[in-house]
Swiss-Prot record:
Zinc-finger is among the record's keywords: no
GO biological process, any: regulation of DNA-templated DNA replication initiation
Chief place of localization: nucleus
UniProt keyword terms in alphabetical order: Cell cycle, Cytoplasm, Cytoskeleton, DNA replication, Nucleus
Taxonomic lineage of the native organism: Eukaryota, Fungi, Dikarya, Ascomycota, Saccharomycotina
Source superkingdom: Eukaryota
Protein name stated in the entry: Mitochondrial morphogenesis protein SLD7
Function: Required for the proper function of SLD3 at the initiation of DNA replication. Binds to SLD3 and reduces its affinity for CDC45, a component of the replication fork. Required for mitochondrial morphology.
Pfam family, one: Sld7_N
Localization (cell): Nucleus; Cytoplasm, Cytoskeleton, Spindle pole
Organism: Saccharomyces cerevisiae (strain JAY291) (Baker's yeast)
Subunit architecture: Interacts with SLD3.
Length: 257
């Protein structure tokens, strides 16, 4: 029998402010010792391709939780962001830490068929790998004096560091691109929700989510060239004024009686 474990609220942060995705209920089919439900808070980190995640992220015996929400904003957000079956949303939890490392705990929310699910990232195997790497470095340090070619290990370490720098540069570039796209999505979502409120359109109306989605998709299509340049790392952010004008034009068109 399923039971509700907790409720998750997480923040989408951007330069124009923060949008909170609320009331994501996590349910489990497995029995738990605690009978009380708690509230988790977190923040959006990034989107990931589930097919490219390391094997240690998800163990075979870990729990997968079913996610539900009565929030129209949350439903619209997940519907828009999880259209790709392999896409996941990484959330860093504020109130929960990994028991072994005392590092922040992470959830990955994803869609499986028509159901919304999530799981906590398993860091156990990562810590084992880190331990093996530390042990290997210690062994290399002990045998360094007996290496016949002086400086050979230094060269290897230097090359490794250069590779890491190159990887970090690529990661920073991707993060910068993701930040620009996330900022576009956050600003667009706020403008649409604000425009609907100004027109007296309540989220209790049957076609509210449909109107939100077609406006969102149409705005993305309108600015497709700018978004393409952003994805290639050569474009600037779409200005607030330009996006506001687009949303106003679309809402006038879609809500015209």
């Amino acid at each position: 029998m399923s039971r509700k474990l907790c409720t998750l609220n997480f923040t989408l942060s951007g330069k124009q402010g923060s949008l909170v995705i609320r009331d994501i209920q996590l349910w489990s089919n497995r029995p738990t010792a605690s009978k009380s439900t708690s509230e988790l808070r977190g923040q959006f980190i990034q989107y990931v391709d589930l097919a490219k995640l390391p094997l240690w992220v998800r163990s075979t015996n870990m729990n997968t939780y079913r996610c539900y929400s009565t929030s129209a904003t949350a439903q619209a957000y997940f519907k828009s962001k999880l259209r790709n079956a392999n896409r996941g949303i990484v959330i860093e939890l504020f109130d929960k830490v990994d028991q072994r490392s005392q590092e922040p705990a992470y959830l990955i929310i994803f869609r499986e068929n028509t159901e919304l699910n999530c799981f906590q990232v398993d860091l156990t195997m990562k810590h084992e790998f880190d331990g093996q790497v530390t042990k290997l470095k210690q062994e290399i340090g002990k045998t360094r004096a007996s290496v016949s070619k002086e400086g050979s290990i230094d060269i290897i370490i230097q090359q490794s560091q250069q590779r890491k720098i190159g990887t970090k540069t690529k990661v920073y570039r991707n993060v910068h691109i993701n930040d620009k796209r996330l900022q576009f999505n956050e600003t667009l979502s706020k403008l649409i929700l604000g425009g609907l409120r100004l027109r007296g359109i309540s989220n209790s109306i049957t076609d509210y989510q449909k109107l939100y989605k077609i406006t969102f998709d149409a705005a993305e299509f309108t600015h497709r060239d700018e978004l393409k340049r952003i994805s290639m790392g050569s474009g600037e952010e779409v200005s607030f004024e330009s996006l506001q004008e687009t949303v106003e034009t679309l809402l006038k068109l879609f809500t015209k009686s």
